[in-house]
Amino acid sequence: MSAGKIVQIIGAVIDVEFPENAVPKVYDALKVAEGGLTLEVQQQLGGGIVRCIAMGSSDGLKRGLSVSNTGKPISVPVGTKTLGRIMNVLGEPVDEQGPIGAEEEWAIHREAPSYEEQSNSTELLETGIKVIDLICPFAKGGKVGLFGGAGVGKTVNMMELIRNIAIEHSGFSVFAGVGERTREGNDFYHEMTDSNVLDKVSLVYGQMNEPPGNRLRVALTGLTMAEKFRDEGRDVLFFVDNIYRYTLAGTEVSALLGRMPSAVGYQPTLAEEMGVLQERITSTKTGSITSVQAVYVPADDLTDPSPATTFAHLDSTVVLSRNIASLGIYPAVDPLDSTSRQLDPQVVGQEHYDVARGVQGILQRYKELKDIIAILGMDELSEDDKLVVARARKIERFLSQPFFVAEVFTGSPGKYVSLKDTIRGFKGILEGEYDHIPEQAFYMVGSIEEVVEKAKNM
C-alpha cells in the first residue's frame, strides 16, 4: 500500500500526490488517514499527482493529510446478507442494524457480459396495472423506463410496480435510490416492511444531499449487488430511482474535473457513462435482471439529451403526461407516447395486439377531433365520430386505476388486474358492449365487472 498526501481541494475534487513509482490506477480507491474518507481516482495528471472524487463530504480536509492507496476499486458486500439492509455507496450499513457480515465483496467497476453470454427473453411480466400491461407490456429480463416531469407520479408508479411485482414475484430485488429525496427512501423502507418483503430487497441509497461522487457511483453499487444474484442463477428485479440524477451527478463531477461541457451543459461523456451502466443491466444464460428505471424529464422536454440518451437502451418506455395527470387520471401514462418492443403479435398474441392497437387508434382519433369539438362543439360531429368520442372517453377513464401504495391518499383500496381481465375489458368497450354505461362508471376501478356494479348504483 503506497501513501501520498493531499495537495489541492476543490469542493468534491481532491488532488493527491504519490511517489512517481507508486501512482494509483484510475478507479482505485484511496483512504484518507484522518477521518477515513474514501476517494476514487479519476485522472492521472502527471508528476505523481492523481485527481480524485470524494465519496463523502470533504469538510475538514486540509492539504498535507496522508492518503493510502487500497490498490483496488471500491468494493461492496454482495450476496444474501445484503437483503433487508440499507447501505450507502461504499456498501456500509446505514440502518443501525450492525455489520453486513457478507462472505464476499465485489468491485463496483465490472465488465458487461459478453455477446455470447447474453440471452434474450420474450416472456411477459404481468404488473397488474391495466395501462402498462395493455399498451407497453414488460418483458422478463427487459429494461423499462418511467419517463415524466416533476410531480406526475414516477415514484408512486415505481412503488406500485415494486409492490405488485416483488410480492407476486418470489425472487430478490435491489433498489438503488440515486439522488432522490430521503423522505421517499424512508417511505419505501416502511412500505417494504409493512408488505413483509423487506427480507427479499437490498436497498442502496445515495440521496440528494450527498456529494456528487456518491450519487454517481451508487447506481453501480446497487447494480453490482444485482449482478451477484443474477450470476447465482436467480431472476432479479433492479429498480433505479432516478437515472437523471445519475447523469446530473456525472455533469457535476465532469465540470469539477475541468472537462468542456457539451450540449445543454451536460458532460461530453454522457453517452458513454450511460452505456457503461446500461450495458451491465442485462440478462445472461445464467439468470436475468429485469430493471425498472425512473427517468426525470427536465421541463417536460423528452428531447433533452439526458432522457434522449436513456431511450436508446430500453425495451419498454412508460411516458407519464402532465395533461393526463391534470384530468385526474392516475396512473398518468400516455397511451399514445408509451412504447414496448413486446407489443408484437408473435410475443403477446394476436388478440392482445389488436385490442392495444384498437385502443390507441380510438384515442388518436379522439385527439384529432378535440380541435373540432373545441371550435364547433359536439353537435357538429357525425354519428360515427360521436361514438368514437364516447368510447374514447370511457377508455381514458378505464385506463385509470386505484393503487395499493396510494390508498392513504385516495381512500379507495388498490386493485390488481390480471392481463386476461384487462384485455377482456378493453375489447368489450371497443366492441360497444358497454355503450349504455355512463363514462363516470369507468373512472378509478379495477376490472370491467366493477364498472357494471358501479353503474347500477349511479
From Swiss-Prot:
It is found in: Cell inner membrane. Keywords: ATP synthesis, ATP-binding, Cell inner membrane, Cell membrane, CF(1), Hydrogen ion transport, Ion transport, Membrane, Nucleotide-binding, Translocase, Transport. GO terms for molecular function: ATP binding; ATP hydrolysis activity; proton-transporting ATP synthase activity, rotational mechanism. GO terms for cellular component: plasma membrane; proton-transporting ATP synthase complex. Its EC number is 7.1.2.2. It catalyses: ATP + H2O + 4 H(+)(in) = ADP + phosphate + 5 H(+)(out). It comes from the Bacteria. SMART domains: AAA. It is a peripheral membrane protein. InterPro entries: AAA+_ATPase, ATP-synt_VA_C, ATP_synth_F1_bsu, ATPase_a/bsu_AS, ATPase_alpha/beta_chains, ATPase_F1/V1/A1_a/bsu_N, ATPase_F1/V1/A1_a/bsu_N_sf, ATPase_F1/V1/A1_a/bsu_nucl-bd. Belongs to the ATPase alpha/beta chains family. This is ATP synthase subunit beta. The gene is atpD.
